[in-house]
């Protein structure tokens, strides 16, 4: 690891171990490197290996230097290949959070050795800005979620007895009943996460970066700035722009299948890298896809270490035979951005993780939301409010309804009843693409002013 590099401004970027966080941080790192900042990108070995194929091949790649974070290794800790949230069995998530916190001492050594001009950190490590402050290194929080859910959480923390001042966006009946008025926190675990997020936001030095854009969340960003007494700078949507002809494991067969379909005739189905639908949820989604009569690609994931599960066992009996060439089911992983960008993709059945919402908007693909937990119901509601998606309503017991899934897929992809959603999704994509790198100007100006460069 090099010490500070001459007169070049150096930035150490330190995301949480989730793939969506890594992806957004990497796209921000690329943008900063194109603006002549030298980037140190710090994560675990398994995560660094995953992002290497997405590093730029041009000379600017020298401006992004990967730095390994070593998590503690002991019999009661996770092995290195599980130092990521990607396909991590859910019961091991608390262990990963604990190991990440225990890496603070090693991160302090990295900070001391590199002595960057600035630390840009994520929202699950309040100890990172504290360590930076002890070395007189300024630190800025980059939040990879939306401003809307952050403002709800912070408002509930600051003013628990006061009504949220912004008109409520869409939140369907089941989620309204489930989430309490306290910013959506319903368990001790959720309260703990909320406290950690709030601490990371408040520790940021006068500026907050957020992976969003004003056309979508301006009113929430303005209120977030008031709550934090900090400048909120949108830098999104930060989305990986794939080369459609580039090599990706398994993509050639997917592309060949997609190339045979009519324009905007296919739905992509995925629930992210950290959520594994139950057997009952899988059956409802499968029956919904079958009844919709729409072409589909469905990515089915199992937790790491689950070598016994077969796709056939996770789906209704005879499902694959009945859908035939109309559907493709992929086990494990598929290049989401490439599939969404393909001209035959006309809808996205999504859990509404924030990165997936941003990708849908960038590529102009309308969303059929099937949120599962955390911030996802709020993200689905925001997409619906913006007119670029619709959410599949659950029954009063919170169960996914196959008829609702089938109906919305047909409406969004095929029928005239949702032409407005398709049109709005295309318009949103055009707005975002017309901005280009303009979204980074405010950020670079804020950083330059902050660092007096």
Curated annotation (Swiss-Prot):
Tissues expressing this chain: Highly expressed in mature fruits.
Entry's Gene Ontology BP terms: carbohydrate derivative biosynthetic process
Disulfide bonds: none
InterPro entries tied to this protein: UDP_glucos_trans, UDP_glycos_trans_CS
EC number from the UniProt entry: 2.4.1.-
Catalytic activities: mogroside IIE + UDP-alpha-D-glucose = mogroside IIIX + UDP + H(+); mogroside III + UDP-alpha-D-glucose = mogroside IV + UDP + H(+); mogroside III + UDP-alpha-D-glucose = siamenoside I + UDP + H(+); mogroside IV + UDP-alpha-D-glucose = mogroside V + UDP + H(+)
Gene3D superfamilies cross-referenced by the UniProt entry: Glycogen Phosphorylase B (3.40.50.2000)
Molecular function via GO: UDP-glycosyltransferase activity
Catalytic site: 21 (proton acceptor), 122 (charge relay)
Entry keyword Ribonucleoprotein: no
UniProt KW keywords: Transferase
Binding positions (UDP-alpha-D-glucose): 273, 336, 354-356, 359, 375-376
Magnesium is among the record's keywords: no
Annotated signal peptide: none
Record function comment: UDP-glycosyltransferase involved in the biosynthesis of cucurbitacin and mogroside tetracyclic triterpene natural products (e.g. siamenoside I and mogrosides IV, V and VI). Cucurbitacins have cytotoxic properties and exhibit deterrent taste as a defense barrier against herbivores. Mogrosides are nonsugar highly oxygenated compounds used as high-intensity zero-calorie sweeteners; they also possess pharmacological properties such as regulating immunity, lowering blood sugar and lipid levels, protecting the liver, and acting as antioxidants and antitumor agents.
Family, per entry: Belongs to the UDP-glycosyltransferase family.
Matching PANTHER family: GLYCOSYLTRANSFERASE
Protein name per the record: Mogroside IIIx synthase
Organism listed in the record: Siraitia grosvenorii
Organism phylogeny: Eukaryota, Viridiplantae, Streptophyta, Embryophyta, Tracheophyta
């Amino acid at each position: 690891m090099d010490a500070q590099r001459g007169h070049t401004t150096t930035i150490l970027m330190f995301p949480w171990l989730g793939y969506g966080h890594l992806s957004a941080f990497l796209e921000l790192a690329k943008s900063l490197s194109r603006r002549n900042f030298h980037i140190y990108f710090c994560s675990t070995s398994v995560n660094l290996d995953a992002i290497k194929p997405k590093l730029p091949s041009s000379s600017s790649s020298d401006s992004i230097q990967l730095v390994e974070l070593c998590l503690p290794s002991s019999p009661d800790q996770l092995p290195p290949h599980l130092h990521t949230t990607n396909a991590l069995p859910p019961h091991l998530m608390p262990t990963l959070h604990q190991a990440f916190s225990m890496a603070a001492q090693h991160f302090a050594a990295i900070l001391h050795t590199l002595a960057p001009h600035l630390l840009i950190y994520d929202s699950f490590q309040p100890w990172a800005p504290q360590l930076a402050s002890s070395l007189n290194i300024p630190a800025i929080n980059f939040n990879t979620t939306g401003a809307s859910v952050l403002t709800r959480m912070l408002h509930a923390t600051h003013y628990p007895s006061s009504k949220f001042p912004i008109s409520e966006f869409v939140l369907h009946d089941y989620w309204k009943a489930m989430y309490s008025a306290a910013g959506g926190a319903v368990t001790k675990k959720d309260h703990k996460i909320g406290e950690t997020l709030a601490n990371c936001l408040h520790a940021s030095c006068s500026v907050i970066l957020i992976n969003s854009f004003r056309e979508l969340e301006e009113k929430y960003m303005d209120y977030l700035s008031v709550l934090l007494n900090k400048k909120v700078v949108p830098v999104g949507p930060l989305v990986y722009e794939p080369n459609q002809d580039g090599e990706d494991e398994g993509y050639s067969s997917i592309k060949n299948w997609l190339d045979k379909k009519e324009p905007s005739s296919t739905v992509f189905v995925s629930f992210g890298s950290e959520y594994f639908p139950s057997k009952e949820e899988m059956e409802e989604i499968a029956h919904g896809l079958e009844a919709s009569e729409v072409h589909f690609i469905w990515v089915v994931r199992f937790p790491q270490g689950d070598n016994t599960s077969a796709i056939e066992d996770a789906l209704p009996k005879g499902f694959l035979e009945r859908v035939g060439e109309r559907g493709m089911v992929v086990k494990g992983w598929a290049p989401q951005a490439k599939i969404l960008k393909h001209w035959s993709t006309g809808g996205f059945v999504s859990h509404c993780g924030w990165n997936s919402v941003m990708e849908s908007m960038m590529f102009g693909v309308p969303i059929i939301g099937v949120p599962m937990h955390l911030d996802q119901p709020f993200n689905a509601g925001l997409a619906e409010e913006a007119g670029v998606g619709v959410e599949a309503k659950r029954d009063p017991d919170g169960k996914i309804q196959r008829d609702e899934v089938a109906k919305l897929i047909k409406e969004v992809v095929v029928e005239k009843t949702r032409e407005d959603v398709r049109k709005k999704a295309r318009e949103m994509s055009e707005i975002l693409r017309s901005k280009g790198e303009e979204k980074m100007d405010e950020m670079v100006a804020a950083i330059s002013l902050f660092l007096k460069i």
